Amino acid sequence: AFRFGLTNERGYGNTYRVLKNITGLWLLQGLKVHLPENTSFADMEEMTREGGKLMHVIDPDDPLFYNPEDMKEAFDSYFRKTGQKLPGVFSEYLLCAYESLCFSFRYHIEKLEQFTGRNIEVLHLVGGGSQSDYLCRRIASVCGRKVVAGPVEGATLGNILIQGLAMGRIRNIAEGRGLIRQACPLRTYQPVDAPDMTRYRAFLEMKKT
Protein backbone atom coordinates (compact mmCIF):
# COMPACT_ATOMS: atom_id res chain seq x y z
CA ALA A 1 0.00 0.00 0.00
CA PHE A 2 2.83 2.40 0.84
CA ARG A 3 4.58 1.65 -2.46
CA PHE A 4 1.39 2.38 -4.41
CA GLY A 5 0.75 5.56 -2.41
CA LEU A 6 -2.53 4.25 -1.01
CA THR A 7 -4.20 5.26 2.22
CA ASN A 8 -7.43 4.51 4.10
CA GLU A 9 -10.45 6.70 4.74
CA ARG A 10 -12.75 5.93 7.64
CA GLY A 11 -16.48 5.89 6.96
CA TYR A 12 -19.77 5.47 8.75
CA GLY A 13 -20.18 2.37 10.91
CA ASN A 14 -16.45 1.71 11.39
CA THR A 15 -15.95 1.07 7.69
CA TYR A 16 -12.78 1.87 5.79
CA ARG A 17 -12.14 2.33 2.11
CA VAL A 18 -8.91 2.29 0.17
CA LEU A 19 -8.10 5.79 -1.07
CA LYS A 20 -5.72 7.19 -3.66
CA ASN A 21 -5.39 10.95 -4.10
CA ILE A 22 -4.67 11.97 -7.69
CA THR A 23 -4.85 15.14 -9.76
CA GLY A 24 -8.25 15.83 -11.34
CA LEU A 25 -9.99 18.78 -12.97
CA TRP A 26 -7.47 21.15 -11.40
CA LEU A 27 -5.60 20.96 -14.72
CA LEU A 28 -8.59 22.26 -16.67
CA GLN A 29 -9.35 24.95 -14.12
CA GLY A 30 -5.80 26.20 -14.53
CA LEU A 31 -6.02 26.26 -18.32
CA LYS A 32 -9.41 27.98 -18.21
CA VAL A 33 -7.86 31.26 -17.00
CA HIS A 34 -6.22 31.61 -20.43
CA LEU A 35 -9.63 31.76 -22.11
CA PRO A 36 -12.18 34.61 -22.18
CA GLU A 37 -13.85 35.09 -18.81
CA ASN A 38 -17.27 33.94 -20.02
CA THR A 39 -15.92 30.62 -21.34
CA SER A 40 -17.77 27.67 -19.81
CA PHE A 41 -16.53 24.11 -19.33
CA ALA A 42 -19.02 23.11 -22.04
CA ASP A 43 -17.24 25.56 -24.37
CA MET A 44 -13.92 23.98 -23.43
CA GLU A 45 -15.25 20.53 -24.25
CA GLU A 46 -16.34 21.77 -27.67
CA MET A 47 -12.86 23.21 -28.23
CA THR A 48 -11.39 19.85 -27.20
CA ARG A 49 -13.39 18.08 -29.89
CA GLU A 50 -11.73 20.42 -32.38
CA GLY A 51 -8.27 19.45 -31.10
CA GLY A 52 -7.82 16.79 -33.76
CA LYS A 53 -5.55 13.81 -33.15
CA LEU A 54 -3.96 13.45 -29.72
CA MET A 55 -0.32 14.53 -30.12
CA HIS A 56 0.69 15.27 -26.52
CA VAL A 57 0.48 13.51 -23.18
CA ILE A 58 1.42 14.47 -19.62
CA ASP A 59 1.56 12.82 -16.22
CA PRO A 60 -1.01 14.83 -14.21
CA ASP A 61 0.68 13.72 -10.98
CA ASP A 62 3.97 15.39 -11.89
CA PRO A 63 4.93 18.08 -9.32
CA LEU A 64 4.91 20.68 -12.11
CA PHE A 65 1.11 20.64 -11.98
CA TYR A 66 0.61 20.82 -8.21
CA ASN A 67 0.21 24.58 -7.83
CA PRO A 68 1.77 26.45 -10.76
CA GLU A 69 1.39 30.19 -11.19
CA ASP A 70 0.60 29.54 -14.85
CA MET A 71 -0.88 26.16 -15.80
CA LYS A 72 -0.23 26.60 -19.52
CA GLU A 73 3.44 27.30 -18.79
CA ALA A 74 3.52 24.19 -16.59
CA PHE A 75 2.30 22.18 -19.59
CA ASP A 76 4.97 23.78 -21.79
CA SER A 77 7.67 23.02 -19.22
CA TYR A 78 6.55 19.39 -19.10
CA PHE A 79 6.54 19.14 -22.90
CA ARG A 80 10.08 20.52 -23.04
CA LYS A 81 11.22 18.19 -20.26
CA THR A 82 9.85 15.15 -22.09
CA GLY A 83 10.95 16.15 -25.59
CA GLN A 84 7.49 16.94 -26.97
CA LYS A 85 6.77 19.76 -29.39
CA LEU A 86 4.70 22.62 -28.02
CA PRO A 87 1.05 22.66 -29.16
CA GLY A 88 0.21 24.96 -32.04
CA VAL A 89 -3.31 25.79 -30.88
CA PHE A 90 -4.93 26.01 -27.45
CA SER A 91 -7.39 23.19 -28.15
CA GLU A 92 -4.42 20.81 -28.16
CA TYR A 93 -3.69 21.72 -24.53
CA LEU A 94 -7.28 20.90 -23.61
CA LEU A 95 -7.25 17.61 -25.52
CA CYS A 96 -3.99 16.68 -23.81
CA ALA A 97 -5.43 17.52 -20.38
CA TYR A 98 -8.62 15.50 -20.83
CA GLU A 99 -6.94 12.45 -22.34
CA SER A 100 -4.04 12.48 -19.87
CA LEU A 101 -6.51 12.58 -16.98
CA CYS A 102 -8.27 9.55 -18.43
CA PHE A 103 -4.93 7.77 -18.83
CA SER A 104 -4.15 8.59 -15.20
CA PHE A 105 -7.50 7.19 -14.05
CA ARG A 106 -6.87 3.97 -15.98
CA TYR A 107 -3.35 3.65 -14.59
CA HIS A 108 -4.46 4.04 -10.98
CA ILE A 109 -7.44 1.71 -11.46
CA GLU A 110 -5.10 -0.98 -12.76
CA LYS A 111 -2.79 -0.41 -9.79
CA LEU A 112 -5.74 -0.78 -7.40
CA GLU A 113 -6.67 -4.03 -9.11
CA GLN A 114 -3.12 -5.32 -8.66
CA PHE A 115 -3.10 -4.32 -5.01
CA THR A 116 -6.52 -5.69 -4.07
CA GLY A 117 -6.64 -8.69 -6.40
CA ARG A 118 -10.15 -7.61 -7.45
CA ASN A 119 -11.46 -6.57 -10.86
CA ILE A 120 -13.01 -3.10 -10.99
CA GLU A 121 -15.81 -3.27 -13.55
CA VAL A 122 -17.81 -0.12 -12.74
CA LEU A 123 -16.52 3.40 -12.05
CA HIS A 124 -18.68 5.79 -10.02
CA LEU A 125 -17.97 9.43 -10.82
CA VAL A 126 -19.33 11.99 -8.35
CA GLY A 127 -18.82 15.73 -7.89
CA GLY A 128 -18.52 18.46 -10.49
CA GLY A 129 -16.78 16.29 -13.05
CA SER A 130 -19.81 14.01 -13.25
CA GLN A 131 -21.69 16.84 -15.02
CA SER A 132 -19.38 16.59 -18.02
CA ASP A 133 -20.90 14.29 -20.62
CA TYR A 134 -17.68 14.47 -22.65
CA LEU A 135 -15.45 13.53 -19.71
CA CYS A 136 -17.69 10.64 -18.66
CA ARG A 137 -17.68 9.23 -22.19
CA ARG A 138 -13.91 9.51 -22.47
CA ILE A 139 -13.32 7.88 -19.07
CA ALA A 140 -15.54 4.95 -20.07
CA SER A 141 -13.76 4.46 -23.39
CA VAL A 142 -10.18 5.01 -22.19
CA CYS A 143 -10.62 2.90 -19.05
CA GLY A 144 -12.71 0.24 -20.81
CA ARG A 145 -15.28 0.19 -18.02
CA LYS A 146 -18.85 1.27 -17.39
CA VAL A 147 -19.12 4.71 -15.78
CA VAL A 148 -22.00 5.71 -13.50
CA ALA A 149 -22.13 9.50 -13.15
CA GLY A 150 -23.66 11.41 -10.23
CA PRO A 151 -24.67 12.76 -7.88
CA VAL A 152 -22.93 16.11 -8.26
CA GLU A 153 -23.14 17.11 -4.57
CA GLY A 154 -21.91 13.80 -3.18
CA ALA A 155 -20.32 15.15 0.00
CA THR A 156 -23.35 17.27 0.87
CA LEU A 157 -25.79 14.41 0.33
CA GLY A 158 -23.63 12.09 2.40
CA ASN A 159 -23.67 14.61 5.24
CA ILE A 160 -27.46 14.89 5.04
CA LEU A 161 -27.79 11.11 5.03
CA ILE A 162 -25.72 10.71 8.21
CA GLN A 163 -27.65 13.48 9.95
CA GLY A 164 -30.89 11.76 8.96
CA LEU A 165 -29.62 8.54 10.51
CA ALA A 166 -28.62 10.32 13.72
CA MET A 167 -32.04 11.96 13.97
CA GLY A 168 -33.90 8.73 13.29
CA ARG A 169 -35.43 10.04 10.07
CA ILE A 170 -33.63 7.36 8.03
CA ARG A 171 -33.52 3.76 9.25
CA ASN A 172 -30.25 2.62 7.68
CA ILE A 173 -27.64 3.37 5.03
CA ALA A 174 -29.44 1.28 2.41
CA GLU A 175 -32.62 3.34 2.81
CA GLY A 176 -30.63 6.57 2.62
CA ARG A 177 -28.88 5.49 -0.56
CA GLY A 178 -32.23 4.60 -2.07
CA LEU A 179 -33.55 8.08 -1.30
CA ILE A 180 -30.51 9.65 -2.94
CA ARG A 181 -30.96 7.51 -6.07
CA GLN A 182 -34.58 8.67 -6.28
CA ALA A 183 -33.65 12.33 -5.84
CA CYS A 184 -30.58 12.30 -8.10
CA PRO A 185 -30.99 10.25 -11.29
CA LEU A 186 -27.70 8.72 -12.39
CA ARG A 187 -26.32 8.50 -15.93
CA THR A 188 -24.57 5.42 -17.30
CA TYR A 189 -21.86 5.35 -19.96
CA GLN A 190 -20.38 2.35 -21.75
CA PRO A 191 -17.03 2.19 -23.57
CA VAL A 192 -17.45 3.18 -27.21
CA ASP A 193 -14.11 4.11 -28.77
CA ALA A 194 -10.83 2.25 -28.37
CA PRO A 195 -8.18 4.23 -26.44
CA ASP A 196 -5.02 5.48 -28.13
CA MET A 197 -2.75 2.71 -26.85
CA THR A 198 0.35 4.28 -28.40
CA ARG A 199 -0.15 7.39 -26.27
CA TYR A 200 -1.11 5.30 -23.24
CA ARG A 201 2.14 3.35 -23.51
CA ALA A 202 3.97 6.68 -23.70
CA PHE A 203 2.10 7.70 -20.54
CA LEU A 204 3.20 4.49 -18.80
CA GLU A 205 6.81 5.21 -19.71
CA MET A 206 6.46 8.65 -18.12
CA LYS A 207 5.22 7.04 -14.90
CA LYS A 208 8.45 5.02 -14.71
CA THR A 209 10.70 8.10 -14.67
Which residues does each PLM region occupy?
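Active-site core segments that coordinate phosphate-bearing ligands/cofactors
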Residues: 1-122, 131-155, 161-197, 201-208
